[in-house]
UniProtKB/Swiss-Prot annotation:
This is S-ribosylhomocysteine lyase. Its cofactor is Fe cation. It catalyses: S-(5-deoxy-D-ribos-5-yl)-L-homocysteine = (S)-4,5-dihydroxypentane-2,3-dione + L-homocysteine. Binds 1 Fe cation per subunit. Involved in the synthesis of autoinducer 2 (AI-2) which is secreted by bacteria and is used to communicate both the cell density and the metabolic potential of the environment. The regulation of gene expression in response to changes in cell density is called quorum sensing. Catalyzes the transformation of S-ribosylhomocysteine (RHC) to homocysteine (HC) and 4,5-dihydroxy-2,3-pentadione (DPD). The gene is luxS. Belongs to the LuxS family. It comes from Oceanobacillus iheyensis (strain DSM 14371 / CIP 107618 / JCM 11309 / KCTC 3954 / HTE831).
Length: 153
């Protein structure tokens, strides 16, 4: 990495991080004082492992639907293109420990799920590409490593 790039994660040395972890990427303040907190929920070790798409896709649906049951501050949660984690954006919410609890409860919801929400051609752009069991396996692995979530390096 020779020059600073516009994208924060491109400035992160992916060879130094130790997944799984939950990292505050940054805080953006709007013109009216609202603050958006963006988190890197890294599930797999970069360049060593990744989530297979059907499980990741189902985990995305399950987390997007369920995390909002645990906080009104959620703006968005979505997968990284590298398939190693998710980004979570919250508005006016700066309690890191609460974020960890929110993620934990959401992953526990995934383990209890009996179906993937919005897993149909009307509500999803690739409805044939889902795996509830794959999502639950990823969630279980992440929960098993909860003690290390706040250790990035």
């Amino acid at each position: 990495m020779t020059k600073k790039m516009n994208v924060e994660s491109f400035n992160l040395d992916h060879t130094k991080v130790k997944a799984p972890y939950v990292r505050l990427v940054g805080v953006t303040e709007g013109a009216n004082g609202d603050k958006v907190h963006k988190y890197d929920i890294r599930i797999k070790q970069p360049n060593k492992a990744h989530m297979e798409m059907p499980g990741l896709h189902s985990l995305e649906h399950l987390m997007a639907e369920n995390i909002r049951n645990h906080s009104d501050a959620v703006l968005d949660i979505g997968p990284m293109g590298c398939q190693t984690g998710f980004y979570l954006s919250l508005i006016n919410h700066d309690d890191y420990d609460d974020v960890l609890t929110m993620i934990e409860k959401t992953l526990e919801d995934v383990l209890q799920a009996t179906e993937v929400p919005a897993c149909n051609e009307v509500q999803c752009g690739w409805a044939a590409n889902h795996s509830l069991l794959g999502a639950q396996e990823i969630a279980k692995e992440m929960l098993n490593e909860k003690a290390s979530w706040s250790e990035v390096f």
